[in-house]
């Protein structure tokens, strides 16, 4: 995915989850933060941030904060809407016959439903069904990615839905889009949310596969370049 109109600024502060103050060309602007996570290790006073100019000129906030240069690391895309967009682009080239976003399953909406058609030994067409939930990883500690950066009961619910679906014959995938370069693994952040780590273990035991999606990150672009399943 490509951002159409970007500018750079310096982070000042973050009054709440939704907005931040950023100095752009010498003027402190109130901007929308496209990530409601904590991001405390990223948004430090004075760091260089990247913003997209809002398409609607009449919007109250004229900019979206989409990326940040982490001190001692490099550029990290922190747009929480980006992972699903880049996965949709990536899935289009993965040989699936059907790809449906926002698929209703059980009491949740799973990010993607996919199908692949094949012929069985008797010459009959059969469908392989897939469910994929997508999470974005922006937390890096000592060269390893971690998720989540804040407790997420919703994330646990999705893992349980995938585990149940695996028992019903679906191929279930928990995909982590790593929104930074140089990282190829994501571990459960049991320090922040021990229950999430347990839910991941239970999902894997039920047959859910964990997929790490590595990206190329530029100020105006995020793109998946490779994928690797846990254990490969």
Please tell me what each predicted stretch does.
Residues 45-56, 214-215:
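Flexible glycine-rich surface loops and low-complexity tracts that mediate binding to linear polymers
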Residues 9, 110-118, 127-149, 162:
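Conserved catalytic cores of phosphodiester-cleaving nucleases, focusing on short active-site segments
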Residues 27-41:
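Beta-strand/loop nucleic-acid-binding surfaces
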Residues 56-72:
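OB-fold/S1-family single-stranded nucleic acid-binding modules
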Residues 16-21:
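Short aromatic-glycine-enriched beta-strand elements
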Residues 40, 71-101, 120:
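Acidic-basic catalytic patches of nuclease active cores, encompassing PD-(D/E)XK
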Residues 179-232:
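Domain-level recognition of nuclease-like catalytic cores that cleave nucleotide substrates
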Residues 143-153, 163-192, 214:
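Nucleic-acid nuclease catalytic cores
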């Amino acid at each position: 995915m490509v951002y159409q109109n970007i500018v750079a600024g310096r982070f000042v502060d973050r009054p709440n989850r939704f907005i931040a103050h950023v100095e752009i060309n010498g003027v402190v602007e109130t901007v929308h933060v496209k990530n409601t996570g904590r991001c405390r290790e990223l948004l430090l006073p004075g760091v260089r941030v990247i913003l997209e100019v809002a398409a609607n000129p009449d919007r109250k906030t004229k900019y979206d904060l989409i990326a940040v240069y982490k001190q001692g690391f490099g550029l990290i895309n922190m747009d929480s809407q980006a992972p699903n967009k880049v996965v949709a682009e990536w899935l289009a080239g993965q040989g699936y016959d059907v790809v449906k976003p926002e698929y209703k399953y059980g009491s949740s909406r799973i990010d993607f439903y996919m199908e692949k058609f094949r012929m069985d030994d008797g010459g009959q067409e059969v469908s392989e069904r897939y469910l994929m939930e997508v999470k974005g990883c922006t937390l890096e500690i000592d060269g390893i990615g971690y998720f989540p950066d804040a407790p997420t009961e919703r994330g646990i619910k999705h893992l349980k839905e995938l585990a149940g679906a695996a028992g019903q014959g679906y191929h279930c995938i928990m995909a982590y889009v790593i929104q930074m370069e140089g990282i190829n693994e994501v571990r459960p952040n049991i320090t922040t949310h021990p229950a999430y780590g347990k839910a991941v273990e239970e999902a894997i035991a039920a047959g859910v596969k964990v997929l790490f999606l590595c990206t190329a990150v530029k100020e105006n672009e995020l793109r998946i370049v490779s994928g690797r399943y846990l254990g490969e």
